[in-house]
Amino acid sequence: LVTMHRRENQGQPMRAVFGALREMVDQEPTIEVVYPVHLSPAVQEAANDLLGDHDRIHLIAPLDVLDFHNLASRSYFIMSDSGGVQEEAPSLGKPVLVLRDTTERPEGVKAGTLKLVGTDPTVVKTTMTELLTNESLYLQMANARNPYGDGRASERIVQAIKHYFGQGEAAEEFHEGEKE
């Protein structure tokens, strides 16, 4: 699964990533790519020019959040420049190759759920190859502790309210980076 739309990546950086992606799909017959293409004319043009005629690269319309999460959960890994995807994918156990040189989500890099790749085509291809061929690396990223939560916030809120009213023990705290 690929998403790429940031203005900073439009133009040559985006074209470089798309070229690398196409080369990887050409070299590896088992790779299928789904790319919900952003509505930006610059993104549409680059995607259609470089990826549009490949039978294993599927350019589709942008998805609503439920359909996107459904697709992401069925993906092997995700390549994206989206901050939201960087936060959501770890909840699905999906490694993310971040198509940027920096991120506003350094906790994801620190936890091991994200890897900064940038837009250099050589780095993109090398990192994709590593994730596709190194099962240990894949499992390490896929099973890393989600730094954005463990899915138990509602339980903790209910427990905290009960505790406040003297109806139970204090809620267990979430500690970023600790594996259960």
PLM region descriptions:
Residues 1-35, 40-180:
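Nucleotide-activated sugar donor-binding and catalytic core shared by glycosyltransferases
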